[in-house]
């Protein structure tokens, strides 16, 4: 396993992107991605090897993948998840689920940005963890 990115929820994605750009980060993608199924807007920024995924509700009046996390804090920006690259997502998920420490938050599905497979598990102490399996060429 290798760390891929840190996912943060924010109430104002434009202001948060600007703050990171002023700190020397660069945009990974040219535009904010609107992910309709999860009612969220996403942008990735990076500095060296560090990638931060910024997520904000697209419509605050509707349920959102990140909206519930934002309701638990008065901060405008909060850690949402950790993300790891894995070689075999099915084996990783099965092995971790067998420990009894994880629950499935979202089953294996296609990723938003790349043609990869992702899965979200919830660890009882760590919280939400995303796993990426990159396409085999």
Give the label of every model feature segment.
Residues 29-39, 61-74, 105-115:
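A cross-kingdom feature marking solvent-exposed beta-strand/loop segments within repeated
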Residues 57-59, 85-89, 134:
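Beta-hairpin (beta-strand-turn-beta-strand) motif
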Residues 2-12, 41-46, 52, 67-91, 93-137:
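Vicinal oxygen chelate
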Residues 16-19, 92-96:
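Hydrophobic side chains in well-ordered alpha-helices
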Residues 1-38:
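Long, hydrophobic N-terminal alpha-helical segment
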Residues 53-63:
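A short, Lys/Arg-enriched interface patch at domain edges and termini
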Residues 16, 27-28, 62-63, 128-131:
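Short loop/beta submotifs within extracellular cysteine-rich repeat domains
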């Amino acid at each position: 396993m290798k760390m891929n990115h840190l996912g943060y929820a924010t109430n104002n994605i434009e202001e948060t992107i600007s703050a990171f750009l002023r700190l020397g980060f660069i945009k990974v993608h040219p535009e904010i991605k609107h992910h309709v199924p999860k009612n969220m807007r996403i942008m990735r920024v990076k500095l060296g090897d560090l990638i931060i995924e910024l997520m904000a509700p697209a419509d605050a009046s509707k349920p959102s993948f990140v909206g519930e996390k934002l309701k638990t804090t008065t901060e405008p920006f909060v850690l949402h998840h950790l993300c790891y690259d894995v070689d075999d997502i099915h084996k990783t998920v099965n092995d971790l689920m067998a420990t009894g420490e994880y629950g499935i938050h979202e089953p294996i599905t296609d990723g938003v940005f790349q043609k990869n497979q992702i899965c979200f598990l919830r660890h009882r102490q760590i919280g939400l963890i995303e796993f990426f399996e990159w396409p085999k060429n």
